[in-house]
Amino acid sequence: MEGPAFPDKEASMHFTSGVNRPPYEAGSAFLQVTSGCSHAACLFCGYFKDTCFRKSPLEEIEADVKEIPRIFGTPERVFLQSADAFAADYGTLMKTAELIRRHVPSVKSIGGYARIDNFFGKSAEQIRAMKDAGFLNPYIGVESGDDAVLKAVRKGYTAAEARAQLEKLTEAGMPFIANFLNGIGGAGFGLSHARKTAGLYEGMSVSMIEVSSLTLVPGTPLFRLREKGKFREAGEHERLREMQEFLRRLANETVFLSDHVSVPFRVRARLPEQKQELVDGIQRLLDGIPEEELRRHRDAHPIM
């Protein structure tokens, strides 16, 4: 997640939490449908701690939709705000899509960040209707498929619950973007985290997997646990071996994207065609770059 950013040109729209987006959504228009995070309990997250969760009223959403052409021109995609925009109820999301079609006809698709539990109350039929209305590739912050890790960082759901929701999206024909949070389990948890997360995604319609690497943010509970000696970070080489194992185990036809500053290399690759090339490239990093140099890269980019 990048942000919060709050460009001056967007000041006439409602962005209570600023604008938060993945790097690849830089060319999208932005529209707030929620503020803050509906969960706000993940131990590693430093975002939205000062923003109470709120669902935007439809009249506010409509006013902002009408501003999109003036501020963003003729965008082809809208990326909904904020931390988990799909926490908005089905009716609100469908009405939002209708408003976008009416006032911003250039838009071809609608995305946004989502949590697994945002889909608990939405049926496969509703998700299929959302896809037909223009929703495509929501970015789901799954983080891990390892129950021990999910529980330790208080994600708020189990791997089985995550799989059930991803299966629902797949059944509904809704492709999605998911992530792999490298190092989230801390020292010693990497290989289990890698294997179980790759297994979670098997058979799912995941169109892209974006990788980022855990960076402890001052003020977060996980940062304080490290300061007290109750959490031990994975080393840089351990993280690379973890990512290597994730790639080896991943069976999906998908795009693997590393574009986050927390990761020491940038790549966009098609899997499985370029899998071995990635695995070999990571091995060259392991063989050629000392732990200390990789750590300096992390310390120079202190964001999650």
What are these regions (language model features)?
Residues E125-I127, G186-G203:
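Catalytic cores of alpha/beta
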Residues I61, L93, S123, A162, ...:
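Aromatic/hydrophobic pocket-lining residues that form the small-molecule binding cavity
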Residues D117, G141, G145-V149, L169-H193, ...:
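Conserved strand-turn element in the central/C-terminal portion of the radical SAM core barrel
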